[in-house]
C-alpha cells in the first residue's frame, strides 16, 4: 500500500476512535487538525420557530424547545399549530403570552430572580430539555358540548418561570419574498444579542413594542404561506399589488374595466372578510387568479362592466356589448376546460365567481341574458365532489379550515337552497360538521357562526320535506321544537350587545361584529323555523317579538356604504317577509336603505328590497289586490318593470266579471312564490 494511502487510512481510523471514545490522544488530535464539536441534535431552519417568527424575535432554535418558547411556557413548533386556525384560540393564546411577559417583567423589576437558589430552581424549570406546556391540550376536563364549534378551552398554566442565565448569540436573519416563484426582495442581516449586562432595577423598565407578541392584525389574519413574515407582506403589499395588476394580460380596451374592478369592485365583495383579514390575502389571491385563469378574468371584467353601468350611469350599446362579450368568453373558456377535463380548481373558482360576483354588484332588473345561478352551482357542486373538498379536512378538528372555495360553496349552498325550497347539496356534510364541532370558515367569511349556518341547513331540509309532503304536521312540529332547542345552544353566555367600533381607537372589532351579525342570523333562522309550523301567523306575539329583536340588533351593526347591511341580505329578507305592516323593522330597513344611497339598488340588497316591497304590496292589503297570471308573464318579459300589475276594483260589478282573476288572500303568498311568478332567479345572500 502506498505511504499516502496508509497515512489517510490511519487518520480516518483516528477520527473514528475520537468519536467513539471522546478522549483522543495527542497524536490523533494532530492528525484530525480540528477541535472537538458537539453533535448537532437537529437541522436548523432558516427563520426559527413559529412563535418567534410571529413575534419577530431571534430564535436560538434549541431542541426540543427554543429559549423564548421555554420562557413563555408554550409549545415550540416549526409548523403552523392547530390553534392558529381559529380566531378565538389565537386571541386566548395572545392574552396568555402577554400576561406571561408582563409577569416576567414584574419579577425582574421586583428583583425576584436575584436569589441564587430561586434562580437555579427556575433555570432548571425552564431548561430546554424540560417539558413545556402544550396549549393544544386541555388543562382540565370539561363537559363536551354537542353544539360547540370549538374544542374545550385549555387551562392556564400557573407555573412561575424566570429568564435564562445571561448569554450572547449572533443571529443571521434572511428574509425573501416570492411572487409566483419569482424573488422580489431579499434582506439579510447579522446582529448580536447579549444579556450579560444586568438591568438596573432602580430605573423604570423601557417599553418593548415587540413584546406585545402579536399585533392585532396578525391575530385577525393568517398568512397563507408559512415562513413568510406578515409584516414584510404588509409593507410590500402596495408594490406587490401594482406588480400583479400590471402582469394581468388584458387589451387596452379592457384595461379600464380591469382597473375599475380592482379599485371599486374588489373591496366591496367580501366586507366581513375585509374586517377580519384586512382583505390583503384574498385580494392577492384574486389578482393572481386574474393573471392565470382566463375564465376568471372574463367573469371579473363582465362584473366590472355591470358595476360601471349601474354606478356611473353608462348607457348604450357599447357597455352592453362589453358585458355580453365577457360573459360569452367566460362561458366559452369554462366549457373548453370542462371538455378537456383539466384545471378543475380553476374551473371551480371561476364558476363560483360567476355566481357570487354577479349577485354582489348586479342590478335588480338585469335584462341581459345570463345563465341562472343554480345552473352554475350544479356544475360547481360536481367539481367540489370530484376534488373531494367536503372531506379535505378530517372531521373533529375545529382548528383546521377547509379551502376557501369550499367555504364559499357552503355559503351559497346553505342560503341558496332556501331560495328554491330544496335540500342543500352538502347537507350531510354540514350535519356531520355540526355534530363534530368542526368549522367551515363561514364566520370569518360572511359573519355568521358556523353552528347557526348548519342549523339553517337543517331548517331548509325540514322546509323541503314539508313542501314535498313527506312528513305530516305532527312531525313538523316535533322537528321545529328540536331545532329550536338547538338554536338556543348557539347563544353566547354573554348576550349583551355592544357597538363593534373600539371606543379608544375607533377601529372595527371583528369579534364583536360577527357576534352581532350572528345574533341577527339566529333570530332570522328562528323566524324561518316558526313559519313552518302549520297555522303560523305573522301577527302572533312571538313573531312580533322576534321581528322587533332584529330591528333592535341592527342598531349595533354599522350601516351606510361602508357598513355591513349587504352582508345581512338573507336575515333581512326572512324578517321582512314575515313582518307586520306596523312593524318598526320596516322603518329601520327603509332608513338603512336610504343610507346606502345608490348601492341600495345594486346586488343582493337591491333585489331583496325589491322582493320585499312586492311581498308587502300583495299581503298587507289583500282585500282589493288582484293577480292576473297572464299579466305576469308579459310583464316579466319586458325590460322595464317585471313587477306584476296590481289592479284596484272600482265597483262590485268588476269583481263579479273578473273571472280570470283570483283574489290573493292574506298569508297565502310566500316570498318564494313571488320570485317564481315574476321569473326572478335571485340569490339573496
Swiss-Prot record:
- Domain of life, per lineage: Eukaryota
Q: Where is the composition biased (Low complexity)?
A: 626-642
| Keywords for this protein | DNA-binding, Metal-binding, Nucleus, Transcription, Transcription regulation, Zinc
Q: Which GO terms describe its molecular function?
A: DNA binding; DNA-binding transcription factor activity, RNA polymerase II-specific; zinc ion binding
* Cell wall biogenesis/degradation as UniProt keyword: no
A Pfam family reported for this protein in Swiss-Prot or TrEMBL = Zn_clus
Q: Name one GO cellular component term.
A: nucleus
**UniProt entry tagged with the keyword Iron:** no
The induction annotation reads: Expression is repressed by laeA.
The phenotype of cells or organisms lacking this gene is: Increases radial growth, remediates the germination defect of a laeA deletion, and increases virulence in the G.mellonella model of invasive aspergillosis.
Fetch the SUPFAM superfamilies from UniProt.
Answer: Zn2/Cys6 DNA-binding domain
Q: Which residue stretches belong to region Disordered?
A: 1-42, 626-668
* CDD domains per UniProt: GAL4 (cd00067)
Ranges of Polar residues composition bias in the record: 651-660
Q: Which residues bind DNA?
A: 49-76
Summarizing the function annotation, the protein's role is: Transcription factor that mediates stress and developmental response.
Q: What is this protein called?
A: C6 finger domain transcription factor nosA
Q: Which gene encodes it?
A: nosA
